[in-house]
Amino acid sequence: MDRPLRLLAWVNLFLCLGLYAAAVALYFVNQPAPAWRQTIDLEVWNLSVLAILFPTVGLLIVVNQPRQLLGWLLGIIGLITAITVLATQFAIYGFYTQPLAHTLPAVALWLRSWLWIPIICLVAFFMLLFPTGRLPSSRWRWLAYGLLLTTGALTVINLAGLAHLPTDFTAEPALTSPWERITGPLLVSFPLLLLMSLSSLLVRWRRADVLVRHQIKWVVFASVMLGATLFLGDLVVEQIWQDPTVRIVVGRGLIALGFATVVIAILIAVLRYRLFDIDLIIRKTLQYRCV
C-alpha cells in the first residue's frame, strides 16, 4: 500500500534535480548578465537549498514514514521551487538571450509571478504542523484557514495579471490586475501568519516532554534565523557594504543560509533526537544489510 508513495517520493526528487539542472544550464547560457539582472540570476544558487535539499530531506522522511505529511510538504516545496527557478531562466532566455516568437517565455514569466506564493504558504504550514504532522489542536484551524485564504487570494490576483513583476524584467507592458488594490494588505498579512505559525511551535514546546522539546527548539531557532535573513538581511547588508554587487551577493547568500539552517535543524531533529524514529529504522536497515 505504501510502496507507490515511496516511489512517488523518489520520482519527485529526481524531477526536482532534473528541473534544477536544466535551470543551471540555462543560467550559464544566459551569461553574461547585465547589472540589473544580478539579483534574479542569483536565485539559481540561493534557491538551490529549497529545490534540492528540501525534497531530499522530504524523501528521507517519506521513505520511512510514507504517510507523514511533513515529508510531502518538503517535497512539494522543492518541486515548486525548481519549477520557479527554471521558469525564470527560460523567461530570460526567451526574452533576451535568444528572443523567441512564441508565447512560452511569457508563460514562464507568468509562472514566476505567482509560484512564490504557495512556497511561503507551505513553509508556514510546515511550522504549523511540526513535529507531528497535525495541528497542535482544533483551536489552530483558524490559522490554517487563514493561510489557505490568503494564499488563494494572492494567487488569484497574480494569476489575473503580471502587475507585480519587476518592470525591468521584460520590455512588454505589464498587465494589471483588477484586484491589485488589496494586494498590499494581503502581503502584510503573510509575515503575520508566518509568525503565528512559528508561535505554534512555542506552544508545542511548552506542552512537550524533553525529547520533543529538543526536536522543536532546533526548528524554532532555524525559523527565527530564516525570518531574520528574509526580512532584515538586506537592511543590515546595506549598512555594511556600499558596492551594489557585494550587497546582492551577500544578501542572497544570507537568505540561502537561512533556508540551509532549516534543513540542518530538521536533520538534527530526525537523526539526533529520533523524530519519526527514522534513526532507528536506518540503523536496523544497516544492521540487516551487514548481516
Where are these regions (language model features)?
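Alpha-helical transmembrane segments of multi-pass integral membrane proteins
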Residues: 1-291
